[in-house]
C-alpha cells in the first residue's frame, strides 16, 4: 500500500495526515505533520477479549523523543526514561475525549502510542497527537464513534486565535484545548487570566467550529485507507435477567440512596448488590454472563439516582441542585510549616501546605524545547484512606498528576511576579477525605495556604465541580457534585476563578446533545457556587498573613557585574566562607542581582554588609579602617576592603621620622588610613599621617624631621 496523504489549513498552520508507509503492522497508524512538528500515532487492538475482563482496557502513551529537537538525553544512560509530568498530562488529554466513544460492553484491549518524532519549538505536539489518535482509530476499523477533532484557542487583543504559537501564547489571556466530534464537544482543558464566562464559552464554540477542518480530513483519509469495520456487536440484553434484577434490587437502592452519610450509604448499596449477585450470578456462569449482570446493576443504580434528581427529589445527600455543601476553613494548622490550610467541604477535605524556598529550589524541567525552571509547583496526593479503602502508596498516578496540574492552572493567574515576591513556592494538597470535587478543594485550600504563608496573591481563587444529568429534553445542573454524582452523571466540569473571572476550566462530556445553552446554564450556576465559596474564604482569610518565623527571608541587592568574581572568589572560596559565617544562602545572577536567603534578618543583613564591603569601590580621599596584613622594610600592606590592599609607605606612618616600622605597627593591628591615590592599575597609596594632627613648630622655627 502506497502512502496516502491529506492536507488542510489549520489556523496559520499546514497540517498533513499520512498513512501507509510507517508502522504498517499496527491496526492503524498515522503521521501528523503540523509545521514540522511530527507525531507518529499507532493503534493496536487485540482480537480476543481477555478471560474475566469486565472493563474497557484502553491505554494511551504519549512519548517525546529528544532526537525530535536535535538533542541527546542527559543522565548516565543517555536515553529516554519514564514519562515526564508533561507527557503524562498529554496522555490523559488524548484519553479523555476518546474513551467515551467506544461502545458499552467493548472489552478488547486497545493501546494508542503517540511518538513525537520532530519538534518545532513554536508548535506544541498535543494537538497533532490528539488528531493523530483520532485518525489512527478511524483507520483501524474498531467500533469507535469518531472521528474526534481538537483545537487550541487563544484570546489575544480581544480576539480568538486558532492554534496560536508558543510565542503568541505568552501574550494570550487564554490557553484552551477543546476536542469533540462533528456534532458535540467532548472535552475542554484551559487556563485563563480571569476571563468572564461568556468569553470562555465563546472559545469552546469557536474551537469546535474550527476543528471541523480536521474532522473532514480524517473522514477523507478513512474513506480512502480505512480498514474494514470489526465484526462486533454489543451483547444482546437479557430482559428477563434485567426484570429480575429490578425486582431484587430497585427498592433496596431507593432506600440506600435516602441515606445521606457516604459510608453508611455505600454499605447499604453493597448489601443490595451482594444479595442481587448471590441470586443472579451462579458458580457455573461464565464471565461474559456475569459481566452482563454487573453492567445491568450499574445501569439500574444510575437510573435510580438520575430519576430522583430529574423528578425534583433531593439529591443523594439531601441538597437541592444549587446548594454547596457546608464549608469549614482553618489556617495555620501545622505550626512549623510556612503556610497551611485545612479546607473541608462536606465529606471532601484537603490539608494544603505551602513551603517557600529560594531560586535554588526552582524545579528544572527538561523539555523538548530545552530546559527551563518553574518557581511554582503544586502536588496533589490522594492516599487510599481518603475514601476509606486500602491500596498502594507510592509514586503519583496519572489521576493525581492531572488533578495537581488543574489546581496549579487555577492559581497561576493570581500569583505575584518574581519581582514582587522572589520566593519559589511549593504547594502540596493532601486529600484526607474524598467524596467528590477534591481537585477543587485543592484550589481553595491552595489559595488559603499561600496566603497563610505570606504570598501576596492578587485575589482569592475558589473552585467548584459541577455535574449534569440529561434525559431527553429534561436536564438538571448539579452544583458541587458528590463522587457518585460524578460517576453516574453525563457531564462533569470544574470551574475555578476569582470574583473577576475564570482562571481554569475543565470539562468532560460523556453524551452527545449538550447544547451551547446547556453549557451556558451550567457555567452561570457554577459562577453562583464560586461566589458563595469565595465569600466564605474571604470571611476566613481576608488578607495575606505575616510570613512564618520559619520561612526564609530574602534580601535583594544589586552589585556591579564586574564584581561578581570578587564575591565568588577563587574556586568559590569567598562565597563559601560568607555562607558559612552568616548561615545564609546567596544566589548571584549574571546581571549582578543578588538574593540572600536567611532565617533571621540579622544574618541576612550581615551577609549584605559583607557583600557591600567586597564590592565597594575605593574612593580617593576617603578614610578606611583595616588590618595590617604584612610588614615591609619600606612600609606596610593594609587591607582597606575585602580584596583591596594598599601600600602604607614608611613616610606616611607618622609625622616624625620612622626608623623601625615594628615600633609603630604589628601584623593584624587595625589602623585608620586615608586613600591618597589610586593609579590606573588600581594600586592604592595610603596614609596614616594625614589623619594625625601635625606637631607644633619648635621655638627655633624648626620642625621635626618627617
Curated annotation (Swiss-Prot):
Single GO MF descriptor: magnesium ion binding
Catalytic reaction annotation: RNA(n+1) + phosphate = RNA(n) + a ribonucleoside 5'-diphosphate
PROSITE patterns: KH_TYPE_1 (PS50084), S1 (PS50126)
Domain of life (superkingdom): Bacteria
Keyword terms of this UniProt record: Cytoplasm, Magnesium, Metal-binding, Nucleotidyltransferase, RNA-binding, Transferase
Residue numbers binding Mg(2+): 486, 492
S1 motif domain boundaries: 621-689
Record's protein name: Polyribonucleotide nucleotidyltransferase
Protein's organism: Thiobacillus denitrificans (strain ATCC 25259 / T1)
